Amino acid sequence: HGVIMLGLTGLFDETLQKPVKASLVTIFKSYGEALCHKKLFIFAACVGLVSVFSYCFAAAAPFIAQNILHLNAADYGYWNILNMVGMFCGAIVASRLIKKYESVQILLAAITIIILGFIVMGLFSVTGTLTTIGFFGITAIAYFVSSWIFPTASHIASNAVDCKANASGAMNFINMGSAVLMVAIMGYLPFEALWGFIGVVLVFAVLCFIGVVTIFLKSNLKLEIYFQ
């Protein structure tokens, strides 16, 4: 599929102001530059947070449902409807939020909600008060705000460099790569499925939050210096 797509690139017009010759050396160099771009990397990782949460949930939730919540397959399927409802409603709300607030503000709010949600899930687990509605309620909220993260983070990441194609390719690589890596790490952690799920998503979300805040503060500092 990739070879076919590469072969068809000659059919498209050049969109860059300074045309760049299509060659393997140029392609790898451009992808390398895109992957090393801090802003693109951080916001692509935020897109990856959505995949990390979704993939880790898909891997861990069946074990959590069976061993901790004591649900059968049918009940697990019914409770999963909450997640689909959360995702659907989140997409509707996201379209309205984007019109009123800055993308970074929406992104930080969504990541903060995920962090707080997983902290609460951990507290429920420690105190032995984690219920089915508590677990799926928190994951439904996480799916709800994940619908805010994807459009805002992907928009910022794809516009971080001049070449949108390279930005998109690098973003998707970071997105899927982070998801695969975190699922693999979760599988090797010496904890039960619930704590592996909480730990991996929580740590990744905190790292994304720190990265976005760092970029945001640096950009504000540059603006202040410029206006002075």
Please place each PLM-identified region on the residue numbering.
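C-terminal membrane-cytosol helix-exit motif in multi-pass small-molecule transporters
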Residues: 1-18, 212-215
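Juxtamembrane intracellular "pre-TM" segments in multi-pass secondary transporters
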Residues: 13-44
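Pair of pore-lining "gating" transmembrane helices in MFS-fold secondary transporters
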Residues: 36-56, 140
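Short amphipathic helix-loop junctions that connect adjacent transmembrane helices
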Residues: 60-74
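Helix-to-loop junctions at the C-terminal end of transmembrane segments
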Residues: 90-104, 190
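C-terminal transmembrane helical hairpin of 12-TM major facilitator-type secondary transporters
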Residues: 105-152
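A late C-terminal transmembrane helix in Major Facilitator Superfamily
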Residues: 144, 153-193, 200-204
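Intrinsic disorder in cytosolic terminal tails and internal cytosolic loops
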Residues: 215-228
